[in-house]
Amino acid sequence: MEDQAEELRELMGNTPSSTQKKDESSSHKTRIIAITSGKGGVGKTNMAVNMAIAYAQLGKKVILIDGDLGMANVNVLLNVVPQYNLMQVINRQKTMSEIILDTEVGIKFIAGANGFSKIANLSVEELDYFAKQFAQLGNADIIIIDTGAGIANNVLQFVAAADEVYVVTTPEPTAITDAYGMIKIITTELGERNINIKLLVNRVHSAEEGKKISDRIITIVGQFLNYKVDYIGFVYDDSVVSASVIRQKPFMVVNPTSKPAQCIKHIVGRIEKTDLGTSDGVSSFLKKFLRKK
């Protein structure tokens, strides 16, 4: 696995196309966000979709990747039917530009694939092709990855490679417990990488409830795991969310003035105020992705 990562570093550092990309946009950085959760049913995908739309409404170039490889449903919320996914790129059947879908909500969408982890076993030539294809995403301002729920291996790969990780939970005791469990696994398995973890509390009835839940988790994480987790914000429990799911129209589009939409805008605004540090965007993502078995 480490050999594959080293090969990819060489390929991405020395190919003419990658050199041109650096020269053309040396100051451009792609922010890569992974949105995850300890359990299903907490609204993780809804958060990913609507955050992507909120970024697009700010004038950002946004790509949303469905990384929930077992129960992919981003396309359901967007009401699109993807004909191709990342597996066709991995198998060199399609180019990246051929699988990216434009959507009516202003974002681009890439469907995931159950075999995505196969890139760890690609030959040098196959890695070269995939690296060049994936590097095309470097023109985006924001890439949001909706991971699967829980601690599957591919979830940890996405978490390890992203610039920032947002763990979604709700006020339910089981969701809080599972959020802590997810953070524990991340810090145990990937602690040496100093993953940038933030909490997003969904379906709250007040700002105070969101803060109380986040404080509880952050305190326990600090006490028992000796790890710093930040609170990024909350989203109100509101009937417009379930109604938008039924209509397959994100609430940022159909109810832009609703409480949940305002919450998402506030969260995105807070994210935008944080520095990306030394991240190299898409190139850095691929290198880190291959390091995690």
Language-model segment annotations:
Residues 1-38:
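Extreme N-terminal, non-catalytic leader segments
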Residues 248-293:
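NTP-binding/hydrolysis catalytic cores, primarily Walker-type P-loop NTPases
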Residues 223-252, 263-266:
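Beta-strand-loop-alpha "switch" segments that mediate conformational coupling across diverse proteins
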Residues 170-171, 197-211, 234-241, 256:
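G-domain G4 guanine-recognition motif of GTPases
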Residues 32-96:
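Walker A/P-loop NTP-binding active-site region of P-loop NTPases
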Residues 131-134, 176-194:
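Conserved C-terminal guanine-recognition region of P-loop GTPase G domains, centered on the G4
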Residues 67-141, 191, 246:
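P-loop/Walker-type NTP enzyme "switch/lid" segment
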Residues 133-138, 152-174:
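Inter-motif core of Ras-like GTPase G domains
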